[in-house]
Amino acid sequence: MELIERVNGHFLESMAAKQLAMEVLPGTIAQAAESMVACLMNEGKILACGNGGSAADAQHFAAEMVGRFEKERPGLAALSLATDTSALTAIGNDYDFERVFSKQVRALGQDGDLLLALSTSGNSLNVIEAIHAAHERQMGVIALTGRDGGQIADLMTADDILINVPVERTARIQEVHITIIHALCDAVDYMLLGGD
């Protein structure tokens, strides 16, 4: 019985985290989706980065954009900076791990593009460096963070968007992040394609 209760606890915590996010984040998520659509309609692209589970989320987001989410549509310009093992290992080896995303942002990012920066702690140094690089390239930033937003919260400019999940446990933050990513994909499709 103890194990069942432990398992149930995960579901209960996840529901509570999502309930809290639903109370405080929809307006910010909608604003982020509008920013993404504006970027894409102006022939910009969205670069996404993160570490570990956040790297998987960055890749998941890019796949939904380039492929499709739930509706058929042409591919949308998005790229995960966490998937090119040659670039990641070359930059990490020749420079340092803190620059694995920022070097790619400086090489690929342009004025009008967006950076989707994911960090559950808000303190991932390579994501912070990517945000600095995006600002240098005149790119907007949408940051998905957790807890108190960490150092990333302090880097946001008036043009950037911080979507912060105000819970402590990393697993719960990640679960809310993937829900936010799906909500962003759905909102982008809704604005571009209309429908129900």
From Swiss-Prot:
Cofactor comment: Binds 1 zinc ion per subunit.
Coiled-coil region: none
Subcellular location: Cytoplasm
Reaction catalyzed: 2 D-sedoheptulose 7-phosphate = D-glycero-alpha-D-manno-heptose 7-phosphate + D-glycero-beta-D-manno-heptose 7-phosphate
Zinc is among the record's keywords: yes
The keyword Cell membrane appears for this protein: no
Gene Ontology CC terms: cytoplasm
Main localization (coarse): cytoplasm
Gene3D superfamilies (alphabetical): Glucose-6-phosphate isomerase like protein, domain 1 (3.40.50.10490)
Names of the cofactor(s): Zn(2+)
Functional pathway: Carbohydrate biosynthesis; D-glycero-D-manno-heptose 7-phosphate biosynthesis; D-glycero-alpha-D-manno-heptose 7-phosphate and D-glycero-beta-D-manno-heptose 7-phosphate from sedoheptulose 7-phosphate: step 1/1
UniProt: Zn(2+) binding residues: 60, 64, 174, 182
Top-level taxon of the source organism: Bacteria
Domain (SIS) ranges: 36-196
Further comment found in the protein's record: The reaction produces a racemic mixture of D-glycero-alpha-D-manno-heptose 7-phosphate and D-glycero-beta-D-manno-heptose 7-phosphate.
Family note: Belongs to the SIS family. GmhA subfamily.
Record's protein name: Phosphoheptose isomerase
Organism field: Laribacter hongkongensis (strain HLHK9)
